A protein has these predicted regions:
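Peripheral, non-transmembrane regulatory/ligand-interaction domains of membrane transport proteins
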Residues: 1-249, 258, 262-269, 355-356
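Hydrophobic alpha-helical transmembrane segments and their immediately adjacent juxtamembrane loops
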Residues: 261-356
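Membrane interface segments of multi-pass transport proteins and intramembrane proteases
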Residues: 244-253, 325, 330
Length: 356
């Protein structure tokens, strides 16, 4: 096994495009990561932002070329980098787009796959990122807007143990990338389920006043994830069963069926979690309604207790001269005693009725 030097045929990159950069100051750090391998050779090269862009190494005969683009928003630079592969301008337009529904498109000599990945921020917000794959006979091009390190582990595994990839075709490499995308969803779904369980435990406690808002956010996150996983399922299904995709045939379809099965597991698990979230919302609303009823019951009891007291005080508050009770020596204490007896009697009555 030999290492390939970082040399290649010169590429005429225009002078104003020789630096990897982003169009905006707050755009992600841009980079191009290259992996070249064949049956007995392996090499990796990195072209990072802010440095002079050297000629991207051209694959030799029999080599598979994987180029991973991160945060490349410069249309001119992207067109120049993809020119040797004959990529259609509509594909480049899709790659530069911020939002694309997961899909697969078959061109003459390559497949174009659009996908989305998600991650939870430290603040608990579910963010998304676009991922694109272009799969040809001897090349795979992958694109990601944000430097989230989606394929970093795969590149590191290749570097530490290149024998695992040597001699493999682009179909196997594409399977590894697609499998990594699906595995990333398992990580997100695990975090999602942890949040569901945390809210479920605090559902009947008063320690969290924003619990309804959190349940609503979980419901919204489930809708977003499902909206992506459903079309992804169709993409994996087409890759696994369509015979006109000449890149994927034979043993590679077995691997793709495995990815399809994993995607189905994700959907089933997500549906179960979503049902649990909907149940939690119903339980929480029922709990709040029951607590409101309890409060209204207490207020009603208090109102009923004071109604006869109000009648008594109203009667003796009338301005009549001939009211004999007003002149009784113990009239005041008798009325207070009567009120107290009414209160005690009503409390005993409500207690026996279990209204308190």
């Amino acid at each position: 096994m030999s290492k390939q030097p970082n040399s290649a045929d010169p590429a005429e990159i225009p002078q104003d495009q020789t630096v990897l950069r982003s169009n905006t100051d707050n755009a992600p750090r841009s980079a191009i990561h290259q992996t070249l391998y064949s049956a007995d050779t392996f090499a990796q090269h990195d072209y990072l932002a802010g440095k002079k862009l050297p000629d991207i190494a051209r694959p030799q005969a029999g080599q598979t070329n994987w180029l991973h683009f991160v945060g490349i928003n410069d249309a001119a630079l992207l067109k120049h980098a993809l020119e040797p592969y004959g990529i259609h301008e509509l594909v480049i337009e899709d790659i530069l787009s911020r939002k694309q529904r997961p899909k697969i498109e078959d061109y003459d000599n390559y497949l174009f796959i659009a996908a989305q990945v998600y991650h939870y921020t430290a603040a608990g917000k579910l963010n998304s990122d676009q991922v694109y794959l272009i799969i040809g006979k001897d090349f795979v091009l992958s694109f990601q807007q944000k430097p989230l390190g989606l394929f970093s582990q795969l590149r590191r595994q290749m570097s530490e143990n290149p024998r695992g990839i040597l001699g493999k075709n682009t179909a196997f490499l594409a399977y590894c990338l697609l499998d990594r995308i699906v595995d990333d969803y398992f990580i997100v779904l695990e975090e999602y389920n942890n949040r569901v369980e945390a809210i479920d435990k605090s559902l009947f406690k008063n320690e969290n006043s924003d619990i309804l808002g959190k349940i609503h956010r979980l419901k919204r996150d489930a809708v977003r994830l499902r909206r992506t996983l459903l079309p992804l399922r169709d993409v994996f299904y087409q890759l696994a069963v369509r015979v006109d995709f000449t890149i994927f045939k034979g043993e590679s379809t077995v691997y793709l069926r495995d990815v399809y099965d994993h995607n189905m597991q994700l959907l089933e698990s997500l549906d179960a979690s979503r049902d649990m979230v909907l149940s939690m919302m119903d339980i929480y609303l029922s709990f709040q309604s029951n607590r409101m009823n309890q409060q209204m019951r207490v207020l009603t009891v208090i109102t009923i207790i004071f109604m006869p007291l109000t009648v008594i005080t109203g009667i003796y508050g009338m301005n009549f001269d001939n009211m004999p009770e007003l002149h009784w020596h113990y009239g005041y204490f008798i009325v207070l005693g009567l009120m107290l007896c009414i209160i005690v009697g009503l409390l005993i009555f409500f207690s026996r009725r279990k209204w308190l």
